[in-house]
């Protein structure tokens, strides 16, 4: 039985599906996906449909799932002139931001090809994404969250953070958040953290593990086994 974490797959179905062969994934193992499964790539919905069928793949919400749900939940039914007229300016601005600026166009195209039943199933699955997970592996406590913990206080309960504080703000990787826990995040590519465009490996420092290796930009998809701390790259 092994515990794995990955993040920021960004619609790359080919790399996603290779994870399971590469780590010899079994029903006794667990894979935590720390958000941003969707957008940019062309296989976002295909990945979600596969994840839905795997009881031991645990999804954590990222800002891209948050944006996608906001838009797709309004588009689940057939779009007519009447429904278009009902969309307010805030929704239209949000939809354009997601599709044009954040890579949601491919996800939207995939979603529109689904049957009504599968559209509803995708939305119900997105509603199951948790804002964070706390786990213990080999005596070490881990907090898994998409982007970090904005307005952080060490004694602040995790369930008192807002969703925005967990999916948008970039973590400070030079700061120790917890003395006795390891914070694992995605969201910010390692190349951005290190200001090194060539960086594409998992970063471990200051009781913090950054696992976004840049898959959304054509770089590695990183997977980390918490039992052995072995790093796997696809």
Regions found by a protein language model. Give the residues of each.
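A general structural motif
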Residues: 26-28, 54-56, 139-140, 179-181
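N-terminal active-site segment of His-dependent metallophosphoesterases
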Residues: 1-50
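Active-site glycine-centered loops adjacent to acidic/histidine catalytic or metal-binding residues
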Residues: 8, 35-36, 62-63, 186-187, ...
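Active-site neighborhood of divalent metal-dependent phosphoester bond hydrolases
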Residues: 44-47, 53-133
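Acidic, His/Gly-enriched loop-helix segments that form or flank divalent-metal centers
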Residues: 100-210, 214-219, 230-233
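Active-site environment of divalent metal-dependent phosphoester hydrolases
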Residues: 10-14, 39-42, 66-69, 187-195, ...
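Residue-level marker for buried hydrophobic side chains located in beta-strands
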Residues: 5, 33, 59-60, 143, ...
């Amino acid at each position: 039985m092994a515990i794995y974490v990955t993040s920021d797959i960004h619609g790359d179905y080919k790399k996603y599906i290779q994870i399971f062969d590469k780590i010899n994934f079994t029903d006794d193992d667990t894979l935590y996906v720390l958000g941003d499964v969707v957008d940019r790539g062309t296989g976002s919905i295909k990945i979600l449909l596969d994840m839905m069928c795997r009881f031991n793949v645990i999804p954590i919400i990222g800002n891209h799932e948050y944006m996608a749900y906001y838009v797709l939940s309004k588009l689940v039914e057939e779009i007519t002139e009447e429904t278009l007229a009902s969309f307010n300016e805030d929704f239209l601005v949000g939809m354009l931001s997601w599709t044009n600026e954040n890579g949601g166009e491919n996800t939207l195209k995939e979603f529109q090809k689904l049957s009504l039943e599968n559209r509803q199933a995708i939305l119900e699955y997105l509603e199951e994404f948790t804002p964070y997970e706390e786990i213990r592996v080999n005596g070490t406590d881990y907090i898994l969250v998409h982007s970090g913990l904005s307005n952080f206080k060490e004694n602040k309960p995790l369930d008192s953070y807002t969703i925005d504080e967990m999916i948008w703000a970039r973590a400070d990787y030079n700061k120790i958040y917890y003395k006795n826990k390891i914070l694992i995040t995605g969201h910010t590519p390692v190349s951005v953290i290190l200001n090194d465009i060539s960086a594409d490996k998992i970063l471990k420092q200051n009781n913090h593990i950054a696992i976004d290796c840049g898959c959304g930009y054509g770089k590695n998809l990183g997977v980390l086994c918490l039992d052995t701390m072995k790093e796997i790259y696809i």
